[in-house]
């Protein structure tokens, strides 16, 4: 005989589905909260481990009243310049070598170059405002602003000239503007696959449009998403999965650690947004006279057909030809003592891929600057 419990009505199917859906949503919400908390905790701990693993290389200097609240990191190594060099006697001047990085690369990116140059010269790399161990700087982030900050940094740090100045990629803009602003400081220059003030205008139309789209500032939603990914450790995880090629993993990990802060992202974006203004400042900087100059040019392109979309192999061949045979050659002619060297087995990141060629170029310009009357 059926019991009373057996005679209870069965809940409708719709009601059971609602119940299961509610439980599922509760479970997913709990899982999401757990993932967010776990990701944030992971990133919090990892950042503090980074601070222990990768202590500051160099020293921070406040730039003074002209640049309130701006502190830049300067990393100098090698022998101090001769204290009583007589500029009237050839061979007695000991220039200091100054290194300026490409867009998005902290001062530590010069490590392979700086370690070798320090064996024969005083050499300094620095983090531009917002990079590495430096504070954020005022907007706009043009090459003129960057040059003025570098000049103030060298003054407060007591790193006296003259200088052999070296610029990679966007750093080439900065060192040329610096030379135009402070010509008596500079006795020689090395440009390492350096940006050219006419490079955007000289690109084929398809690539110009693609690069313009790529350089369009991100939307507020994209910036928020990037910030969330950074705070939850997602950026860190993605970087850890990347191919480091032939570079030492410890070197790449330290570069990544310096690139993760929000201020770094803001600084690189600000420099990119001011690229056209910086190019105009380079045009106004003038030439180098008879200063020794070496232009290092990457022999290998960085893009493949279809990247960006719509770009053909012919477009890329045209870009490479214009870059190697025209724009880079024109930089060689900035000085009556200019020289160009193609680094056939390197792409754009010559300081990473062939640092020995950068060291050799610096050594040659350094020696020529010492011998100048």
Q: Can you say where each PLM-predicted feature lies in the sequence?
A:
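Catalytic active-site module of serine/aspartate enzymes centered on a nucleophile-bearing elbow/loop
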Residues: 7, 14-15, 326, 334-373
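An N-terminal hydrophobic leader/cap segment in hydrolases
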Residues: 25-60
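N-terminal cap/lid segment of alpha/beta-hydrolase-fold proteins
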Residues: 50-71, 81
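Active-site loop/oxyanion-hole signature of alpha/beta-hydrolase fold enzymes
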Residues: 64-67, 75-82, 88, 128-166
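Conserved HGGG/HGGXW glycine-rich cap/lid loop of the alpha/beta-hydrolase fold
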Residues: 77-133
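The conserved beta1-alpha1 loop
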Residues: 98-102, 168, 193
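Flexible "cap/lid" subdomain of the alpha/beta-hydrolase fold that forms the substrate-access gate
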Residues: 143, 147, 182-186, 190-327, ...
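Gly/Ala-rich beta-loop-alpha elbow adjacent to hydrolase catalytic centers
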Residues: 167-171, 175
